[in-house]
Design a protein with these regions (language model features):
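Rossmann-like NAD(P)(H) cofactor-binding subdomain of soluble oxidoreductases
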Residues: 68-153
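NAD(P)-dependent Rossmann-like dehydrogenase/reductase catalytic/cofactor-binding core
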Residues: 16, 183, 233-324
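NAD(P)+-binding Rossmann beta1-loop-alpha1 motif at the extreme N-terminus of oxidoreductases
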Residues: 14-71
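Internal alpha-helical scaffold of NAD(P)-dependent oxidoreductase catalytic cores
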Residues: 107-108, 130-136, 151-207, 213-251
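Short, well-ordered alpha-helices that flank and scaffold nucleotide-derived cofactor binding pockets
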Residues: 35, 39, 103-107, 130, ...
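Short alpha-helical
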Residues: 50-54, 96-97, 122-123, 197
Length: 324
């Protein structure tokens, strides 16, 4: 419920210090991680849009393969201006809505706030750092199958871990406290080198998001067919090659086979870009394709297959995007 906030916040970074968490973009991913933290007793504040009334009145429900639960009352807000300053802010907005951050983020900021961008793509933090030069940023790379198809209800289908990559956080204690809180909430979380974290997720995202739209297929269908299975692997190797050209040597060609095995073990899933396409919403082409392809090209590495897929996605978006 929105309104005044309370909490016993200690003066130091000891055990008694209770961090305030803000969730900007309480969709499927932000809703899931925020709800898990709130269930563990953390002080979490949710910015909502279309389902504010539902959540403010009835709380937040998580239907999960790992155990469903309901939070009957949460700190729900319709306006960022009504939210308290937070120690950690999770941004779960789609990157097509980055232009909203200069309005949404400032009310939640303190001088030492850590902003974790749980968003798809490469180059996300650099773009946000230009908007907020002095804000501490980290990348949040969620490996999870989750959807939000009903107001106030998050459907958790599979997986659920998150990698955190430090982009510009100067406060080691803040980062350590975040990792401890995630663990306390039952969230499998690792702190990973920033560039490795972003490009590792891109190895999965760039093939599956785009191909799910271009071929109108879920993850299981893409891997069940010999031709599309081979294409998925070829695209993964192209992403790995780009990452290595940019100095991310921790990503090796063997990662493609591990990612495919990981996906085969998942429940059939429509990636977020496919859902955006189905609902005639803007797709996250810029940060998922355009920017990483441009970065690779600057390093002397071309991504011809993914450049073609990017062009197909631009064409599809132009045809299907709803007009005002």
């Amino acid at each position: 419920m929105g309104g005044p906030w309370m909490g016993s916040v200690g003066a130091g970074w000891g055990v008694s210090y209770i961090m305030f968490y803000g969730i900007i973009g309480t969709g499927a991913i932000g809703g899931y991680y925020g709800a898990k933290l709130a269930r563990a007793g953390k002080d979490v504040h949710f910015l909502l849009h279309s389902d504010y009334e539902q959540v403010a009145a009835n709380g937040l429900q998580v239907d999960s393969v790992a155990g469903s639960f309901t939070l009957p009352a949460v700190n729900a807000y319709r306006r960022a201006a009504d939210m308290p300053p937070c120690d950690v802010v999770f941004v779960g907005l789609k990157t097509v809505n980055q232009h909203l951050l200069p309005t949404l983020l400032p009310p939640l900021l303190k001088p030492d706030t850590l902003v974790v961008l749980i968003q798809n793509g490469v180059g996300v933090e650099a773009a946000v750092q230009q908007m907020f030069p002095h804000v501490q940023l980290a990348a949040g790379l969620a490996f999870i199958c989750v959807a939000k198809n009903r107001p106030g209800v998050v459907e958790h289908l599979d997986k659920g871990s998150i990698d955190i990559g430090n982009y510009s956080c100067r406060d080691a204690a803040r980062m350590a406290h975040l990792m401890a809180d995630l663990a306390d909430a039952g969230i499998e979380a690792r702190e990973v080198e920033y560039h490795e974290a972003r490009w590792r997720k891109a190895v999965w995202n760039m093939p599956f998001n785009g191909l799910s739209v271009a071929l109108r297929a879920t993850t299981d269908a893409l891997l069940a067919d010999e031709a599309s299975h081979g294409l998925v692997r070829a695209l993964m190797l192209e992403v790995i090659g780009a990452a290595r050209a940019l100095g991310v040597e921790a990503l090796t060609p063997e990662l493609a086979d591990r990612m495919i095995a990981y996906t085969l073990a998942m429940k059939p899933y429509s990636p977020s870009m496919k859902l955006d396409f189905d609902y005639h919403r803007p797709m996250e082409i810029e940060f998922l394709y355009t920017r990483p392809i441009a970065l690779a090209r600057q390093a002397g590495f071309d991504m011809p297959r993914l450049s073609m897929l990017e062009a197909q996605l631009r064409f599809e978006e132009g045809r299907t995007l709803k007009t005002p």
